[in-house]
């Protein structure tokens, strides 16, 4: 089972590296959104630090949404999705592997460029650490929850708008607790409670969403 997950993840990474725009477009979008705020409201360190939580996570939500649509769509169009359903491993395992690969290509780069965010938004070390921790816990949850919307709309020709309407309301709890943790860190307060809730959301998403995604994919294919 682990070898099957590794095989699917490796396949997804190889395909993505052949189409590097799929990797860099969400990343550039994230950087551009972050950069626009200091340019628009002025380079006032105290103001930027105060609104940094909202800036980072709104940009992260939008960049995640930008990359979601292709999660299953290409496989659906070329017939690979049906072949995956015939693999001698449960479909939820294949789904987990694809979502993990999606996070490695979209969520992990956001974490790696977080030091740049600290410079652009005038974050101190504790606030930056909270940003990193919320991104590490929260971005995989975005991928798992977003994959449900992709699976439901994979058979539609122009499902981008519907995907946004389905997914964005489900992202709101993650946005609330992630920004709350960053705000608490900027004030020198503890934010273990917010991280615990985000961790519970991630565990719930890993446990439950693969089955919902698999059911939605079977409906879409049939």
Locations of the language-model features?
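Aromatic- and glycine-rich beta-strand/loop motifs that create alpha-glucan
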Residues: 1-26
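A structural motif at transmembrane helix-loop-helix junctions in multipass membrane proteins
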Residues: 129, 134-168, 218-222
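Hydrophobic alpha-helical transmembrane segments of multi-pass membrane transport/permease proteins
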Residues: 20-42, 58-60, 166, 170-177, ...
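Junction motif at the cytosolic side of a transmembrane helix
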Residues: 206-222
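Hydrophobic alpha-helical transmembrane segments that constitute the membrane-spanning cores
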Residues: 96-121, 141, 145, 178-179
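Transmembrane helix boundary and interhelical loop/hinge segments in multi-pass membrane proteins
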Residues: 65-85
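Long, hydrophobic alpha-helical segments
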Residues: 52-68
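Membrane-interfacial helix-loop-helix connectors in multipass membrane proteins
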Residues: 40-51, 115-136, 181-197, 220
């Amino acid at each position: 089972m682990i070898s099957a997950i590794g095989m699917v993840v490796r396949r997804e990474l190889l395909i993505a590296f052949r189409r590097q725009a799929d990797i860099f477009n969400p990343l550039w979008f994230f950087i551009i959104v972050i950069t626009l705020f200091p340019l628009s409201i002025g380079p006032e360190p105290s103001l930027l630090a105060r609104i940094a939580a909202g800036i980072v996570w709104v940009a992260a939500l939008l960049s995640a949404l930008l990359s979601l649509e292709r999660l299953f769509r290409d496989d659906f169009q070329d017939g690979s999705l049906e072949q995956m359903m015939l693999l001698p491993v449960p479909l939820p395992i294949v789904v987990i592997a694809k979502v993990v690969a999606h996070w490695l290509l979209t969520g992990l780069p956001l974490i790696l460029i977080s030091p740049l965010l600290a410079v652009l938004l005038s974050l101190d070390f504790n606030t930056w650490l909270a940003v990193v921790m919320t991104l590490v816990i929260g971005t995989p949850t975005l991928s798992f929850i977003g994959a449900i919307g992709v699976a439901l709309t994979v058979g539609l020709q122009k499902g981008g708008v519907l995907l946004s309407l389905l997914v964005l309301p489900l992202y709101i709890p993650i946005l609330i607790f992630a920004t709350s943790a960053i705000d608490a860190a900027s004030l020198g307060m503890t934010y273990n409670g917010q991280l615990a809730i985000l961790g519970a959301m991630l565990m719930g998403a890993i446990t439950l969403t693969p089955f919902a995604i698999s059911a939605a994919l079977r409906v879409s294919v049939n």
